[in-house]
Every structure is written in structure tokens, then in C-alpha cells.
Amino acid sequence: MKQLILVLCLVAISCKEKRYHDQEHSTTVEHVTGALEDILQFQKKMNDEFKDPETSPLPDRYRKDFETLDFYEPDTTYRIAAKFSRTPEALPFMMPTTTERETEEVVFGIITFNLKGSTHKLEVYQNQELLQEEKYSDYLFLPFADLTNGEETYGGGRYLDLTIPKGDTILLDFNKAYNPYCAYNPKYSCPLVPKQNRLDIAITAGVKAFKKD
């Protein structure tokens, strides 16, 4: 896979030095392998969901021949330990969707990260209706847009599901970016990406646009 940088073992003079480098190499390989397994597991889960008539957003005419979503190749460049800053003073607001429906959200925090030589910020939201359900008590919603939209990815942007971190760091993995359901079926109502979450870079990771032909 592209961008997967493995630590090469240097030829060491002593056995002790060689064991040190071998251990470092092994630890790095395990870290990368674990990240890849996590991404591939996400892709499998998505495909299983789309194949299942009980959970698939696809109309029957598309689901019956469905095999797999189109993903970018896993790329750990887009798996980032980002800074997380809470915004406890934020007030609820109504987020527009692709229909007349609106969702009540609160800006729960700001995510700051470095990618492609520059610093970027994204707002992350907590849905006030979902908050009433215990299983969503630590759920955060991150809609974002980037320069791939309308070309390689869905024109309306993509989403990430996150969990409230315990500290001030959060794992931001764009390999798990997915399309809103309305990208597959117009019957769904999907939150629109706020203008402050429009990135001026291309995020070539996650799910690509759905080809209906």
C-alpha cells in the first residue's frame, strides 16, 4: 500500500545493536499492520451493511447486484492523532439537511490537525436527539468537504463517526470517511456540510463516489 513507511533495519556491528533495530522494526510493522486491519475491517463492515436488505440504503435495483463499495486504498497518512479542544459554551443550533428537515446540533469541539504541510481545523458535532439514547452518549458527528468532492467522491461531502476522547487528542482516520445515505437513495435526509468544515485539500481516503451505471 502506498504511503506505508516501514522502518528499515540498519546493519549493526554488535548483536545488541541488531536486536535493538529488529525490535524497533517489529514494533513499527505491528503498528502499521494493526492500522491496516482496522481500516479493512471497516470496509468489510460497510460492504456487509450494504449487502443486507435490512440495513442497506441502496434501492433494490442496485442492491441485488452489489458487490463492494469503491474505496481508496488504505493510506495511514490520513490516520492522524489530532488535537481536540472542547467548546463547552457552544449553544444548540439547527443544522440544515438535504430536505426540509433540520437536526439540532451542538459544536462539541474543534479538531486541529496537520496534513500535507498545513494546519486544518474542523468542527465536530453532538446531535441533541441522539444524545437521549445511551448508546450514543459518547458519539460525535464530523461532516466535511474536500477537493475530491464532485470528482472522485460524492459532491455533497462525506461523514466521519467519532467517539468523545478522554483527553485532548483524538484519532482522525479519513480512511473511514463514508458517504451520506442520500448519495445512494434520495429518500434519505442528510445533514449538509457546514462551510467551516470545507477543507482546501484533497482527502484521497475513505469511500469514493457511488457509480449507479
Could you describe each region identified by the protein language model?
Residues V11-S14:
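C-terminal motif of bacterial Sec signal peptides marking the signal peptidase cleavage site
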Residues F141-Y178:
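Acidic, glycine-rich flexible loop segments
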Residues R61-F66, F93-M94, E104, Q196:
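Extracellular/lumen-exposed scaffold segments
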Residues E17-E89:
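Start-of-domain marker
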Residues M1-V7:
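Sec-dependent signal peptide recognition
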Residues Y20-H21, Y178-D213:
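Extended, aromatic/histidine-rich regions of cofactor-dependent oxidoreductases associated
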Residues F84, V124-Q128, D146-T148, F174-Y178, ...:
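A mature extracytoplasmic/lumenal domain signature
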Residues P88-G155:
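Mid-length scaffold segments of soluble, non-membrane domains
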